[in-house]
Amino acid sequence: MRALFLIPGDAVDQVQALPAVAAVAQQLKFAIQVACAPAVAGVWKLLPAVEKLIPFNFGDASLADWANLLGSVREPDFQLCINLAGGRQVDLMLSMSHIPTRLAAAGFSATQKVNPATGGWPAQALAAYLQPIGVSHDADAFRLVLPREALAEATSRLPAGDGPMLLLSPAGVPGDWPQQRWQELPSRIRTSLPGLRSLELGPADAAHVLERAAMVAASDVVLASDPLSEELALLCGVPMVALGRDGDSLPQRPGVKGLTAATGLDALTPEDVLAALGLA
């Protein structure tokens, strides 16, 4: 039996859906197909349970694109569709499909509508889509299982030594924590922790998400304002401080903290960040 997930959005949206998709595959023993934008399809390399990706640009699809998608979802024998997209076109397409169970937050094509929680960690909010089909969902318990080769390659890229490894991942966008502070922070830490190893990486992208996930998993702690690196750290179970992110949008787990400032990230001092890292 097969399940179809329609998941619009960017790479962060895809990563946040990984635990829910994995839960359906594991608990129902369904084969999984995912429709998502081609630019973010690389994220699904992280989940071997996905048997097929259907590249689809939800935001600017033509009528011909929708017709092609209908053809794709009519051919396999799908028993379930979890629809995170919205709009009349997707409803028309699904209403003409032969999928008997169609779950969505809204839309006339849904055989059952769900009410996702607002607030909290978005990955856990998808539990609302799984409850009607008897699938339990604890996103915080999910962990990525990465290929041994990818982890070995990541380890080879880290600084030599046996001290704790701090991975820095700034977003590199206007309003980010100032670049000079990112660069100076490791030196500040080494005054009390001489063996610290550190590496700064630019923003993650979907095309290289496996490599970034492996770098995160090979580290001891992550300091990030890059949203994709943050989500990967959560799914790898690596301690993390997320700059610019409210703690309520993160799982309530030891070692995971959000750090914000009312007037912007440039108001955060190195001491604020050190305290969040437990190094003050």
Give the predicted meaning of each segment:
Residues 1-280:
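Catalytic machinery of carbohydrate-active enzymes
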